Amino acid sequence: MAERRLTGLALKVGPLGEHDRLLSLLSNAEGVSRFAVPGARRPRSSLAAAAPLTLLELQVGGRSGLARVRQLRVLRSFSGLGQQLETLAAAQALCDLCIQLAAEDPVEGLLDTMQLHLERLEEHRADPELVLAGTVQACIHLLTLGGYGLPLQTCCITGDPLEPPLGQWDWRCSLLAQDGFAIDEQPGAAIQLNPSELALLQRLTRAELPRRRDGELMGPPAVWRRLLRVVEIWSRTHLNRPSKALAMLRETLLAGA
């Protein structure tokens, strides 16, 4: 295998034998790739900096099998997210999502979007409500890039526009986990949203979090937890694996409520 240079985000790092580590890296060029990092478990190793949530520049190569990291340089570390359980769970959930979305092929824009949302988690780490809201929005952005976006504009049964009638509190839409949102209460719905909840969810496809005129985040924590549940259900159904990290985030926030 030819020697090459890669820049990417370390999504996951685990043990490999007695002294090595196995690195899962997200890059623009290759999507998610796995590399052996020889000697990285030795304290004085020059490769010991291969840690989760670090942006790395690597030189990799190898004759056959699992490619090996020859050299690495840390460009940026998001390791501070591990200091609080909420941000750790949020970051882990986003890393797991990237692994699922880019395991087979590169996804254009995924690395840049992931970095952006990790930066926002760092910025908001002292505010659990913003961590929760930012995680929900990040998941929606990543799912959309990966081809699994929530269909938020039309009813999955009738094709009619999903236009939540704000103030009409008896109106409901239902999440049918395989298909999307349907107007009215539907049998077999995984969860139902009222008009303001759906309107808030629809705004999360935009670049910034929805805020009121005074700059405060729109929506109370209970609503954001429901939107997190929507993301959990959709991801589990379409990626065929539940997110333990999202569940941990939800439970952690509930415990602190």
From Swiss-Prot:
Pfam families: RecO_C, RecO_N. One of its GO terms (cellular component) is bacterial nucleoid. InterPro entries: ARFGAP/RecO, DNA_rep/recomb_RecO_N, NA-bd_OB-fold, RecO, RecO_C. Keywords: DNA damage, DNA recombination, DNA repair. The keyword Repeat does not apply. HAMAP family: RecO (MF_00201). This is DNA repair protein RecO. The gene is recO.
